[in-house]
Regions:
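Extended, small-residue-rich solenoid/repeat segments and analogous flexible loops
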Residues: 88, 94-185
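Glycine-rich hexapeptide-repeat left-handed beta-helix
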Residues: 198-315
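Conserved beta-loop-beta/alpha segment of the NTase-like Rossmann-fold superfamily
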Residues: 1-41, 77
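Hydrophobic/aromatic residue at the end of a short beta strand that borders the catalytic acidic motif
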Residues: 1, 6-8, 68, 232, ...
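Catalytic-core segments of class I nucleotidyltransferases/pyrophosphorylases
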Residues: 16, 44-131
Length: 315
């Protein structure tokens, strides 16, 4: 299973019952952005990587799941590096199709398949998962102060602590060991993973905080992704809206990409740290282990392990 896809439970069931070798296929409105299946006599005959728009060999793309047995593992040995410097499982599948009939399993119409290869795709996937989770259970197991207010569907896991004068608006997920408050505000579609923290006078809006991420005081985290064990200094703010209300762009592999979103904050990699009173522009990415000095306005991406000093803010 590729790590950059999100699929529903029905997809796993369909693949588990399929005969090996088999691959998952999906229909998308932009097939030229993916590996497109070549079909021969109704079966799989190979994959064309990112064909020219309008010249796709079919309307099915390789959807990131493969089922094989030990009989097929040799096809994945000694693969050459592709032009983009990766070992492509699709090359092995194309070779395999010359010797075996490879079954095509389509994503069931009643189920979901999402490409989550871009940072903002996680927001769509997390909403689907949160909706699924709230259908399974809507529970409050953690320690909730009688002076806190909870409205709407939420999951608050065992070991979480909701302190006085905190307001949580569902749908929301509060994981085990999470600490919220006092005087904090968690808005709809927020997900706080285990041992993360939203402290005094902090607001979390439609954001994802990964394990151990800390927004301990006077922070605004809007439409943002905060990686594991990030620590945000007091007063760190993520801007999530342009003055002109236009869609926000993000740099992906060196190119500016229109996300199509009018609300999008920052993407902060694991173990990064910000000093006090840091302001981060919409669509900015901060790499893992980066340091942002106090008082800085961050207008550009910061590389993994980078150090951003305030005199760089105007460059």
């Amino acid at each position: 299973v590729y790590s950059d896809i999100y699929v529903g439970e029905g997809v796993y069931k369909a693949m588990s019952t399929a005969e090996a070798p088999s691959i998952l296929a999906a229909v998308t409105e932009t097939p030229w952005e993916y590996g497109v299946l070549k079909i021969r006599d109704g079966g799989f005959a190979g994959i064309v990587e990112k064909p020219e728009k309008g010249k796709e060999p079919s309307n099915l793309i390789f959807a990131g799941m493969i089922k094989i047995t030990s009989d097929h593992k040799d096809y994945f040995k000694d693969l050459p590096l592709s032009p983009r410097g990766e070992y492509e499982a699709t090359d092995a599948l194309t070779s395999m199709a010359k010797d075996y009939p490879v079954s095509i399993v389509r994503v069931p119409e009643s189920d979901i398949w999402l490409d989550i290869g871009r940072p903002w795709d996680l927001f769509t996937a997390s909403r689907y998962r949160l909706e699924e989770l709230l259908q399974e259970k809507e529970v409050v197991k953690g320690d909730v102060s009688p002076y806190a207010h909870i409205e709407g569907p939420v999951v608050i896991e065992e070991g979480a602590r909701i302190k006085p004068y905190t307001y949580i608006e569902g749908p929301a997920y509060i994981g085990p060991g999470v600490e919220v408050g006092p005087h904090a505000y968690v808005r709809p579609w927020s997900i706080m993973m285990s041992n993360s923290k939203a402290g005094h006078s902090t607001e979390i809006k439609a954001s994802i905080l990964f394990e151990g991420a800390k927004a301990p005081h006077f922070n605004y985290i809007g439409d943002s992704i905060v990686g594991e064990h990030v620590n945000l200094g007091a007063g760190t703010i993520t801007a999530n809206l342009r003055f002109d209300k236009g869609t926000i762009k993000m740099t992906v592999k060196g190119k500016r990409v229109d996300t199509g979103r009018k609300k999008l904050g920052a993407v902060i990699g694991g173990y990064a740290q910000t000093g006090i009173n840091v302001s981060i522009y919409p669509g900015v990415k901060i790499g893992s282990y980066a340091w942002i000095y106090p008082g800085c306005v961050v207008k550009r991406d910061v590389e993994k392990g980078g150090v951003f000093r305030c005199q760089e803010a105007s460059t």
